[in-house]
Amino acid sequence: GRKVIVAGNGGSAAMASHVAVDFTKAAGIRAINFNEADLITCFANDYGFEHWVEKALEAYADEGDVVILISSSGKSKNMINAAHQAKKMGLSTMTFSGFESNNPLRQSGNFNFWVDSKEYNIIEMTHHIWLVAVVDYIIGKIEYSA
């Protein structure tokens, strides 16, 4: 265990790829994302699009992992279902969402970050800044802890 799993849809999936690489390369923390076309199409075909991320978590997550789920609206059913699966598995979950303050994803994680906006670009860029800031914080802790 002890890796970070990052998932999102569309622009949030691109962000998941970027931040997973940053966690691994810059912060020295093993991180993966679920953006492989064969994984998405196989699991979505076999389990339904709303369930493919939770099924990927079942297959790839280990005890002690941290799951980061990103959805601008906070209403993406595959992200919500993944949050519930992560909870069942005892994994720590961080969610990143926007739009309505009471969106379902925001209610589903251990740590929930919400952007008070209804503009996709503002929400996505804020999520990106926050996620990169987490990596920078970890790097700072590593570099300055000695």
Identify what each model region corresponds to.
Residues 5-144:
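Glycine-rich phosphate-binding loops that contact phosphosugars or nucleotide phosphates
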